């Protein structure tokens, strides 16, 4: 089988992990103690879920996941929570003191004490796999563990498992809801370090998710649980093709092949529809064309940026539920005619489509309604450079005054790393700019005679 190992790093990664595994269990009919009710006999029926769960001799299903945090409180909640029996206790790894929102602590001083036990555990999980496909790494950009430890881990995973794909789900620091002043520093340091190690990174902007919760679900003051449940639906849509059989199945490497035109430009924009509360869904029937249209609304994106100002390089539509290719083709044709979607001229306007017949699952007591069909769109657009520009600007404001830098230097970093990381980000912005430039402009000279 094509197994995937999930690694959840830091508070954000662990809490996203809780939401995701809760949803996976519901989708596959696995109980919180890891048992699958007896009607699904071992080896009978659909075994695609083994990409994410391993099965013990006793018929218990254990997630192929590792939870890591440099301080124990968040993972202690998992150890005492509803799903405490689901995870192998050794897959929940905690340190003693936290990274204090400091990239240098997560990457150098404290991270290096815990990296070996973590890699050991990952090695054991990898040994149980018959054909390991890759890693899904969940973390935030802003925290110390999420930024520092993740970048350390990605470097080591590249050494140990060179050819395996590594996909990230990263929480991008939100302008309004900031948990730390130094988020821009951490974000830029971690992006610079992991840029060459990550194959594909799905960014999730907290503010964008907040707005979706407020606007579409009528939650006045969304909590992290609300945000994570929405994020888990998106992660589930992206990974559904690995866990279920469908008409058009997509695997991890296929995403990269279709979404990443150049190795550095690997930050697809995710959009999910329909996000709708239970009382609204009761009164509306959402057709394939409606949810497909909703994907092109900037309001439904996971990162705040405006694709109408950018150009698309690639576009993947992942449908699940009651969807037939005929409807999809009609919906896409309609969008091509009426939407002003600009593709870069070196990329023909292809939409890659995946369809999974498993309808989306709603978490009992959650905010999202149970719907018949849903779609997740992954598009690689030059507009996401706006997000980097925002972050770089904040970095510059602080770094011009060398504010807070002594905390990083005190943990053994050199100031040169800051400027090096910032230059790399400037190069990334430039890359995005160049990708969007039409290719025929620079060829004109050669064609005069």
Curated annotation (Swiss-Prot):
Site (Involved in polymerization): 449
Gene3D superfamilies, A to Z: Helix hairpin bin, Tubulin/FtsZ, C-terminal domain, Tubulin/FtsZ, GTPase domain
GO cellular component term, pick one: cytoplasm
Chief location of this protein within or outside the cell: cytoplasm
EC number of the protein: 3.6.5.-
Pfam families from the UniProt entry: Tubulin (PF00091), Tubulin_C (PF03953)
Catalysed reactions, semicolon-separated: GTP + H2O = GDP + phosphate + H(+)
This protein's UniProt keywords: Acetylation, Cytoplasm, Cytoskeleton, GTP-binding, Hydrolase, Isopeptide bond, Magnesium, Metal-binding, Microtubule, Nucleotide-binding
Cofactor: Mg(2+)
Protein name: Tubulin alpha chain
The species this protein was found in: Xenopus tropicalis
Gene for this chain: tuba
């Amino acid at each position: 089988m094509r197994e995937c190992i999930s690694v959840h790093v830091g508070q954000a990664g662990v809490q996203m992990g809780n939401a995701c595994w809760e949803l996976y269990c519901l989708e596959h009919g696995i109980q919180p103690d890891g048992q699958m009710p007896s009607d699904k006999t071992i080896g009978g029926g659909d075994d695609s879920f083994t990409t994410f769960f391993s099965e013990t001799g006793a018929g218990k299903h254990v997630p192929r996941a590792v939870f890591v945090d440099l301080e124990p409180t968040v993972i202690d909640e998992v150890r005492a929570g509803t799903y405490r029996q689901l995870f192998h206790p050794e897959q929940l790894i905690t340190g003693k003191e936290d990274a204090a929102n400091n990239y240098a602590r997560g990457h150098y001083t404290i991270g290096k004490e815990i990296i070996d036990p973590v890699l050991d555990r990952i090695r054991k999980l990898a040994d149980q796999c018959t054909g390991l496909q890759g890693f899904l790494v969940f973390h935030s950009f802003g925290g110390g563990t999420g930024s520092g430890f993740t970048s350390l881990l990605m470097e080591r995973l590249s050494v140990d498992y060179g050819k395996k794909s590594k996909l990230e789900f990263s929480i991008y620091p939100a302008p309004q809801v900031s948990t730390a002043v130094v988020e821009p520093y951490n974000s830029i340091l971690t992006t610079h370090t992991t840029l060459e190690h990550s194959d594909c990174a799905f960014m999730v902007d907290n503010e964008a998710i907040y707005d979706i919760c407020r606007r579409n679900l009528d939650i006045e003051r969304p909590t992290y649980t609300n945000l994570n449940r929405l994020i888990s639906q998106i992660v589930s849509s992206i990974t559904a093709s690995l866990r279920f059989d469908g008409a058009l199945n997509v695997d991890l490497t296929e995403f990269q092949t279709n979404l990443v035109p150049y190795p550095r430009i690997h930050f697809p924009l995710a959009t999910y529809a329909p996000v709708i509360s239970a009382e609204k869904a009761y009164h509306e029937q959402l057709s394939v064309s409606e949810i497909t249209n909703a994907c092109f609304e900037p309001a439904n994106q996971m990162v705040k940026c405006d694709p109408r100002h950018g150009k698309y390089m690639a576009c993947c539509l992942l449908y699940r539920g009651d969807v037939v290719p005929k409807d999809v083709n009609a919906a896409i044709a309609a969008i091509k005619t009426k939407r002003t979607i600009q593709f870069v001229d070196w990329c023909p306007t292809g939409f890659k489509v995946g369809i999974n017949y498993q309808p989306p699952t709603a978490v009992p007591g959650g905010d999202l309604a149970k719907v018949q069909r849903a779609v997740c769109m992954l598009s690689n657009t030059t507009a996401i450079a706006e997000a980097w520009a925002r972050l770089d600007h904040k970095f510059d404001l602080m770094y011009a005054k060398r504010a807070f830098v002594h905390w990083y230097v005190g943990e053994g970093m050199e100031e040169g790393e800051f400027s090096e990381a910032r230059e790399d980000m400037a190069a990334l912005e430039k890359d995005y700019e160049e990708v969007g430039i039409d290719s025929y402009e620079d060829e004109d000279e050669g064609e005069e005679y």
